[in-house]
């Protein structure tokens, strides 16, 4: 006999309902279908189950297609690993197909892209060079980027445009770039697709170079923030903002832009946001997926996966289903 004062409840009189009456949120009509050989990416997409992330992924594909059809903004916010994963050719192809009306980079993404154009390689072995202080000390990267920024401020242009222009001018002087065809900064500049670069002083390696000019860096990135706010106004009613691989800086920049745009009286509602990353972090979730849609309609999606898999898959789905 139990020594506890409490006795187990008797379920004899518990009221039950029929399974038919209860129903269910998951139905066989929502199940996946086996992949059919030769059906391509479009067939694969159609074969996915109609649940959770699969539905979210399809919704992002449809939102991108709708934004292009309605000539609304398609803005790609990206961290450095998107560039380091070798995705520039995929993104540039999407740009040429009308699936990118602007690129929004943090400092890391800009550095890696600039180095790819300059030298055909990027990304240091930090553990190998940090002990003796060589990390971030590349001469050409620091010199060329800082010079471009200073000249851009002098000429009244932002950081993204200044970096793209500098790479273009290097090519015009005799093909000094090793891999210009792989640069977002350069090819977007040539296509007149805006690129904005958003930095925090001290987070990026060019900031420790002797040529770094804090006033110029601040002025250039602030101008780009104002330009980004202008791009955000074009999200209204049908645009889409994708945050890919920036866990803190760009989600904060985006939220401030949304607030500034609305504060200035621009309508901003009924647009789509999506966060792509291999982990779903707090700030992208609240600042990109959730808060911008409070009391304003629209929808936010969180897609979890590695950039080198998810972005080519997204591009392939767009090309096959909405060429």
Show which residues each predicted segment covers.
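Conserved mixed alpha/beta catalytic, RNA-binding, or beta-rich assembly cores of soluble enzyme
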Residues: 197-234, 238-239
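N-terminal amphipathic/basic leader segments beginning at the initiator methionine
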Residues: 1-36
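Short glycine-rich or small-residue beta-strand-to-loop segments that form or flank ligand, phosphate
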Residues: 72-82, 103-105, 240-245
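N-terminal, Lys/Arg-enriched amphipathic/low-complexity engagement segments
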Residues: 29-65, 69
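Glycine-rich phosphate/diphosphate-binding loops that line cofactor/substrate pockets in enzymes
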Residues: 59-73, 187-191, 230-237, 322
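A generic, well-ordered mixed alpha/beta core segment in the N-terminal half of proteins
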Residues: 86-150
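C-terminal functional extensions of proteins
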Residues: 227-230, 237-240, 247-323
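Ligand-binding beta-strand-loop-alpha-helix segment within the catalytic cores
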Residues: 124-192, 196-197
